[in-house]
Amino acid sequence: MTTMTFRRRAKSFIMITCLLFGVVVQAQQHDDNQDLRAKLFSQVLSDYKDVRECLEQEEGGLRKAQEDMNVEEHDLNRDGVNEYEVELSGPCTCGMVNCSIYIYRKTGPGFESILDDASGFGVELLKTSTNGYRDLLVTARDTAATQGQMTYKFDGMQYREAKNMLVQLETGESKPASRRLQFKRGASEATVNGRVSIALPDTYLVGARAGQTMTIKLTAPRKTVRFLLMSPSTRSLVADNARDWTGVLAETGDYTIIIDSDARNSTYTMTVSIK
């Protein structure tokens, strides 16, 4: 055997060995990835029994749900170990656009949920951090003209919602998705002024007890400005296009007042009393 022939055979052997090694590595990575997906899927089903029961009734059942599951890896606390963003598709966890978003971190042999109350169509990692973990921005469809942008910050144990903004897509105008109406100490009445536009309402939360009497008076230069009042159980309490309302409350909790308009930049003044 000549030296040149030996070298050719040696190179061929090395190339074949490298190719076989690559195939083995890829197969191992695929197996590891499938094992990870199976464990994360099982964790979601264990944490959310209602989701499991719903998925079992869907066409294809749990097998199809696991196949369609999307998993993204993020190193949220920069420790070299990834956390996992998990999204399931289908009506059990999604609306028309928004889907439930879960984030897990590895803990011993299993996984621990660190974000479990988010819903939207994407997670963005912000440059800022809180308690060592990257802040998160979840974007969600609100209406055809608006979207919600929720900022989540880590409190040392879990991600908690820190800010919830409503954004008008055409104009870029934004405002808090809701605000709590504050009464001064000892006062039973509060007045607020604001400005609303098409698809960009003002939403107020008012805490009250069953048996109390609530009165709402709304004044505005434009007749297109009106309000909607909902009970803690989301039952509507006023007729359309209301400007004032008085009633005895049947529930204890947060009542929601939504002020909107069919015109742009509509100003208003609202007075709420609870006695």
Predicted regions and their residues:
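Bacterial N-terminal signal peptides that target proteins for export
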Residues: 2-14
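Bacterial N-terminal signal peptides
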Residues: 12-22
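Acidic, small-residue rich beta-repeat scaffolds with periodic aromatic anchors
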Residues: 26-50, 125-177, 273-275
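Extracellular beta-rich ligand/substrate-recognition surface
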Residues: 58-66, 191-200, 237-238
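Acidic/hydrophobic-patterned starts of short beta strands in beta-sheet-rich repeat architectures
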Residues: 77-89, 130-140
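Non-catalytic extracellular/lumenal accessory regions of secreted precursors
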Residues: 173-203, 211, 275
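Acidic, Ser/Thr/Pro-rich low-complexity intrinsically disordered segments
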Residues: 196-255, 259-260
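Edge beta-strands of jelly-roll/beta-sandwich modules across compartments, strongly enriched
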Residues: 263-275
